[in-house]
Amino acid sequence: MAKDIKFSADARESMVRGVDILADTVKVTLGPKGRNVVLEKAFGSPLITNDGVTIAKEIELEDHFENMGAKLVSEVASKTNDIAGDGTTTATVLTQAIVREGLKNVTAGANPIGIRRGIEAATTTAVEALKAVAQPVSGKEAIAQVASVSSRSEKVGDYISEAMERVGNDGVITIEESRGMETELEVVEGMQFDRGYLSQYMVTDNEKMVADLENPFILITDKKISNIQDILPLLEEVLKTSRPLLIIADDVDGEALPTLVLNKIRGTFNVVAVKAPGFGDRRKAMLEDIAVLTGGTVITEDLGLELKDATMAALGQAAKVTVDKDNTVIVEGAGSSEAISNRVSLIKSQLETTTSEFDREKLQERLAKLAGGVAVIKVGAATETELKEMKLRIEDALNATRAAVEEGIVAGGGTALINVMDKVAALELDGDAATGRNIVLRALEEPVRQIAYNAGYEGSVIIDKLKNSAAGIGFNAATGEWVDMIATGIIDPVKVTRSALQNAASVAGLILTTEAVVATKPEPAAPAMPQGMDPGMMGGF
């Protein structure tokens, strides 16, 4: 396929046009008085949103060279979203500012490699300065404050802080669509997996159709149980304790299932059987998680263990297990806190190395179940359009809150970026590297400038006053007042701010050092069919 190639200034300018188109579309959403962008959807109603990464992903330009520039900025937004979960609009604004200033200097004859070196050095200094002034976030009120700022809703902030308090900072908090108009929080405590009882005759509450097991033993195996003789010695030992038994196995069938059901109906002992969760290697990992949580051992041939040889020592235990037709919940497993902590660390290390989004999602689910529960924020709204917009806002708020807990917070509204300018300005560089440093200094002003502009104020005036104010004092664009940003609750997670700056500097440096751009040449349009010709005459039979 033929290619179009552009070189030097022509190549960079084409890409920068794409950068500007995307950034100008996204940056109108920045700040408390940012506007919305309406996105056409192929199916269903249009999406109204102020989420930077969602907007960036939708933009596709007709010109291939411009589109490459737009896609690079979209990549900045996506990368920032992946790392910090928020700050995508800030990252886009910073990228545009660095690229625009950098291009002026490269066009004037500066060396792009030297400029890039200066940009990298200045960015590193700014990030270190941000980390140095970060304040830790702890406690329900502080977490609620962070979430409220990001979601622009105190109610959502309260839901997120309560969810994190209930399931822990590592716990899974999912966001689902509610059937009603109200947004509500639902928490499932303990480890839950999506497997229910194998027979309805195993229930203990016929009205609710659930089986409640108090202080049960738990048999965990990846084997199929077809012959009752395989587990008979173990059943006899459990029977002596008068405690219920939960069996988690690949399957229970043959004579084994009716035998267990018959003994349950007769009242001989209380037993519930469920299928093991997951499939393949993930099933083995989840069974091991359950074993660690409950203090048991997985009966598996991989460890050279047979069901007929299993002893009471291999059984796990829990304070309570609830099983319905679809789910099993294990509450307060008897596993040691050290073993659980080690297992959590193992899963976290796997999370850091995995490249698959699906694997990442499943690992996070496993982590949450071990950490103590799953919280579900059910989003309600009057219309589907409002529901989609609110769901995106809550997702951003949740991600920002987690980032704040992880690395701390700084003054929001772009104030922290202005406050670290002195550290960057003090960086001793010369030549084109010094030019790169100055480009970053100018870019650090841009988020404040855009927030002010979106709120109807003159950005330059706000920036001048901000530079002469004490550290932490900033401009509240929502009210037009000068306030102590952190005390007022206008904050940004350090992770969000530094990720936005690092990713923006990285991609902007790449664009400035681009010397050639190769794009697919558009295919010429097919010649129009002469009018009046019958399509059936063109060789078709």
Curated annotation (Swiss-Prot):
* Key word Isomerase present: yes
Which gene specifies this protein's sequence? groEL
Subunit structure as annotated in this protein's UniProt entry: Forms a cylinder of 14 subunits composed of two heptameric rings stacked back-to-back. Interacts with the co-chaperonin GroES.
According to its UniProt entry, this protein's organism is Streptococcus equi subsp. equi (strain 4047)
Mind telling me which InterPro entries this protein's record contains?
Chaperonin_Cpn60_CS, Cpn60/GroEL, Cpn60/GroEL/TCP-1, GroEL-like_apical_dom_sf, GROEL-like_equatorial_sf, TCP-1-like_intermed_sf
**GO MF annotation: an example:** ATP-dependent protein folding chaperone
Would the keyword Cytoplasm turn up in this protein's UniProt record? yes
Protein name according to UniProt: Chaperonin GroEL
> What UniProt keywords are attached to this protein's entry?
ATP-binding, Chaperone, Cytoplasm, Isomerase, Nucleotide-binding
Q: What class of enzyme is it?
A: isomerase
Give an example GO biological process. protein refolding
Q: Which family does it belong to?
A: Belongs to the chaperonin (HSP60) family.
Give the UniProt subcellular location, in the record's own words.
Cytoplasm
Write out the GO cellular component annotations: cytoplasm
- Reaction(s) catalysed (UniProt annotation): ATP + H2O + a folded polypeptide = ADP + phosphate + an unfolded polypeptide
User: What job does this protein perform?
Assistant: Together with its co-chaperonin GroES, plays an essential role in assisting protein folding. The GroEL-GroES system forms a nano-cage that allows encapsulation of the non-native substrate proteins and provides a physical environment optimized to promote and accelerate protein folding.
Q: Where does ATP bind?
A: 29-32, 86-90, 413, 476-478, 492
Please name the SUPFAM superfamilies in this protein's record: GroEL apical domain-like, GroEL equatorial domain-like, GroEL-intermediate domain like
**EC number(s) stated in the UniProt entry for this protein:** 5.6.1.7
